[in-house]
Amino acid sequence: MKKIITTTLILLAASFLPAQEGTVPADLLIDIRWQDGDTRTIFSHPVTQVYGQREDSKLYQNVGEVTNVGYYSLNQVLENIGSSWKRQKIDNETVQTTVDSLRKVAAGGYVYLYIERFLENRANLQYFFIIIRDKNDKTLYSKYFQYQAPNVTATRSTWWNYIVTEIPIELEYPFYVYVNDKQSQHLSDFKFRIDAVELKDVEVISVDEVME
């Protein structure tokens, strides 16, 4: 029963995310090509690639392998839920139960991962995992992905894969997302820094605020 409830909550939250697992990801996740030190705004959060840029000969190419991450906080999800449910006049008890449950399942929000690889077997998610670390590089959480077959891109030059995963622990800004490939020769392959939402730091949203 607990697993069914958790799955239902994940699906509910997914309906309020900007792009959902299993769909074509948002263009900004597909189109970004990084150099180390670059900062891009993704879902309102400044995201900086600390390391992981392609070798110099391929640095400025628009085709090739891609590794991109994005982050959507639980507060952003709750804001979306509040706006939607206010229009639908959902009762407070339902809102309370949903908000409390989501905070247990995804207290730290949602991390997006989009990859492209030249070889099909290199783009299967079973070979990837992420590590979340705080500003002092202390490990907070890790997630090893299960088998998920990739899709071929429109140009048929690469294979892509994509997942949105919930983070069950609270996070403080800034924090780091490490993306690691089990098939690579590196101890760690990519490191991204996630900073607070631009323009304002959204405070923790109460049930009353969701319903305002």
PLM ranges: what are they?
Residues Q20-Y173, N180-E212:
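Conserved functional micro-motifs across diverse proteins
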